[in-house]
A protein has these predicted regions:
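Short glycine-rich phosphate-binding loop at a beta-alpha junction
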Residues: 69-70, 261-266, 307
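N-terminal secretory signal peptides and thylakoid transit peptides that target proteins
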Residues: 1-17
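Conserved alpha-helical scaffold segments that buttress catalytic/binding sites
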Residues: 41, 126, 130, 141-300, ...
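A short helix->loop->beta-strand "cap" motif at the edges of active sites that frequently abuts
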Residues: 301-305
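A charged, well-structured terminal subsegment
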Residues: 329-333
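Metal-dependent C-N hydrolase catalytic cores
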Residues: 24-169, 176
């Protein structure tokens, strides 16, 4: 099924990157425009607009005043089709309600602004990957909302509509990246990313996540067609020491052997001890410590190239603490 002409026009094209071509910014912060209609699933939703407001407050802190900033453009149709089926994209567009909300599944709700918000999230991921791969920024953090790592090529799930990390990785591979590592520290396993790249030897997907927990994937035995999937499940109640050990003992050795040209982080903060959607016991300092180690790896092995994409984290108070801990480590602030 082909997209209608109107849908293609709505999807638009990526805007030019507003960075100085002759410089390499230390840190790029990418946020959706203030005037974009919000993705608002309604009262009681976990992924509510207050999450993005908390991230905006966190990134307005004085330590980030020198960071380069850009607004998310809408993702191009070409970028979306690198991961998602055209029939699925059209189905999402057609399902967009003009008012109130539309429930597509038990954990997927669309409001009037959802489709545009999802386009901006995916477009921000592509913009950041482009900036980092083209040498205009060393690292980038994108306030991607709605999140993306559960989204399948033809199905929305787990609050996710477009798979932002997968779209960014495909874009990087289309440039001059030979190998891309997608590293996921969300409390929930990124089943969408894993499925998309199960048979892709140029992409390593590695994840720590709580098990058992939604979506039910992410066992150690799930290793991909080329051994390019590394899962390190955590148990309910695990804290910073177990989290750090899983990265040190399982993921970093695989990362060293893979030798990526770019790191894409699925930065989920729902492992924080106060988050009710999981049962891990992490603190802001645990996310900072991991980010510092990832930054050091990137400096030594891939010219510092990191693109970090917001995934989970459902208490605005926790996001306001964890996001600056993570982004500050990216920027060495």
């Amino acid at each position: 099924m082909r997209l209608t002409r109107r849908a293609a026009l709505i999807l638009g094209a990526l805007a030019p990157l507003p960075l100085r071509a002759e410089t390499r910014e230390k840190l790029l912060l990418v946020l959706p425009p203030e005037d974009v209609a919000p993705h608002d699933p309604g009262p009681g939703a976990y992924d509510r607009p207050e999450r993005l407001a908390a991230v905006r407050r966190a990134l307005a802190r004085s330590e980030f005043v020198t960071a380069a900033r850009a607004e998310t453009p809408k993702a191009s149709l070409h970028a979306l089709l690198a991961v998602h089926d055209s029939t699925y994209i059209e189905r999402l567009r057609a399902a967009s309600p003009s008012e109130s909300v539309m429930r597509l599944g038990p954990d997927v709700v669309m409001s009037r602004g959802t489709f545009d918000a999802a386009l901006h999230a995916a477009g921000g991921a592509v913009l950041a990957a482009d900036a980092v791969m083209q040498g205009r920024a060393r690292s980038a953090f994108v306030a991607t909302r709605p999140p993306g790592h559960h989204a399948l090529p033809d199905e929305a799930m787990g609050f996710c509509f477009f798979n932002n990390a997968a779209i960014a990785a495909r874009h990087a591979l289309a440039l001059d990246a030979e190998r891309v590592a997608i590293l996921d520290f969300d409390a929930h396993h990124g089943n969408g990313v894993q499925r998309i790249f199960w048979s892709e030897k140029r992409v390593l997907y590695a994840s720590t996540h709580q098990m058992p927990l939604f979506p039910g994937t992410g066992a150690i035995s799930e290793q991909g067609e080329h051994g390019n999937i590394v899962n390190a499940p955590l148990a309910k109640g695990d804290g910073g020491e177990v989290f750090a050990a899983a990265w040190r003992e399982r993921i970093f050795p695989a990362l060293e052997a893979f030798a990526p040209d770019l790191l894409i982080l699925c930065a989920g903060f729902d492992g924080h001890r106060h988050d009710s959607l999981a049962g891990l016991r992490l603190e802001g300092q645990d996310f900072r410590a991991l980010t510092l180690r990832l930054r050091d790896f990137a400096e030594k092995r891939c010219n510092g190239r990191i693109v970090s994409l917001l995934e989970g984290g459902y208490r605005p108070e926790d996001l306001e603490a964890c996001v600056p801990a993570h982004v500050g480590a990216l920027a060495d602030a």
